[in-house]
Amino acid sequence: EYIHCDVKIKIKGEEYTVTDAGVRLKGNTSRRRPENGNGKHVKDNADWQHCHFQFNFRKYVKDEEHTIRGVRKMYLKWFKDDAAYCREIFSYDLFRRFGVWTALENCYCRLWVHVEGDKNPAYYGVYEMNETIDDTFLKMRKDKFGSHKGNLWKCNYGASLNYDRDKNASMGESDGSYDPVYEVEEINSDLSTAKSQLLHFMKQLRDLKGQQLHDWLGQAIDINLFLRTYAVNVALGMWDDYWNNTNNFYIYFNSTDPTNYKFYLIPYDYDNTLGTSHNCGVQNDSGRHDPLKWGNSDTSPLVAKILQFDDYKKIYVDALKELCSSNGEFYYTKSIARIKAWHAMIGDYVVNDTGEDTKIKDRPAGWGNHSEYRLWESDDTNTNFFRVKAAAIQKL
């Protein structure tokens, strides 16, 4: 539920103000109040705690003054379970460096929250500012998508693109208390037509075989982009994804025609990466797991259906090896250098009024199953995540 707020943003010395915007809390398992406890706000003596914020500048007033540089929504995310203050920043940066233009834009920022009536604002420290995936996201990439007037779905847990499994799955709009498996984010057709299009894709994936499937995949999907996207996804150790856990992605069809479209997978939610490993799906080690068997292909068939063809598989394997080659963007020395440069920029600002997350540490999430992984403190071949992942890729 949104509440009214005013927003002030400073970008490279230039200030922007939006009055009467909307703000709400965001997150699934990570959603919590910005103030500890269940009571009302404690004036000038609040027990602040980190949480995620979603801003909608045009929630209440829909005019051009309620945008900032053409943007009307913004997602501010705290570095939950990421003492390294870099996992999602690194992930989207790597996507973009590798030519995956469907990856959202993000950056570091500093956040203050001022509750009306309090003497001073609370400093929340260093946050991650994320672009939201919506109609504005599509418009900014319309030349590459071919059209921004198609159908955009947010795929929540259980979205397998498996026709037999998902033909009766929930598809529609979220009502705030319930999120369907396939959640409408932006559609330019009626819901029935959008559903037919989504089910057509799944059914084609199930029914077509051999050369007919190969050719349809090449026509319906930007195969090179898709496989480079998935190469980055696997290099990052993203186990909570489509292939392994039927979770955390968007899909976009660039037309409203139920049978004639281009399908795009948009990567999403990359904080549990880079050595934050977990016993999930077919995996128990996100560093060493076989990149060709990343998930259960019977449950989530799309990637395996593509990789069964030698020419498509070569694109994927070549992309993985390009990433971790000595000249690649995932090579451990280059990756460590980028992370250290970011830390030099933000290090003086992480101490904050919540008292949480006040030190940068090279540790994966405490609930993970491989606590030995490191990003920059060690370059050991058995514990440095970049080197462990590269070794797994070189076996292909």
For the regions a language model picked out, list residue spans one by one.
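Middle-to-C-terminal accessory/interaction subdomains
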Residues: 44, 181-244, 248-396
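Short, solvent-exposed loop/turn and secondary-structure capping segments
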Residues: 19-20, 31-42, 65-68, 87-89, ...
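Internal "kinase-insert"/substrate-recognition segments embedded within catalytic cores
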Residues: 48, 52-63, 69-83, 98-104, ...
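A short glycine-rich, hydrophobically flanked beta-strand micro-motif that places a catalytic Asp/Glu
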Residues: 2, 104-111, 245-251
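Conserved NTP-binding catalytic cores of kinases and kinase-like/nucleotidyltransferase enzymes
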Residues: 1-90
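Short, solvent-exposed loop/turn segments that connect beta-strands within catalytic domains
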Residues: 12-16, 115-122, 256-261
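Metal-dependent nuclease catalytic cores in nucleic-acid-processing enzymes
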Residues: 89-99
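Short beta-strand micro-motifs enriched in acidic
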Residues: 26, 114, 252-256
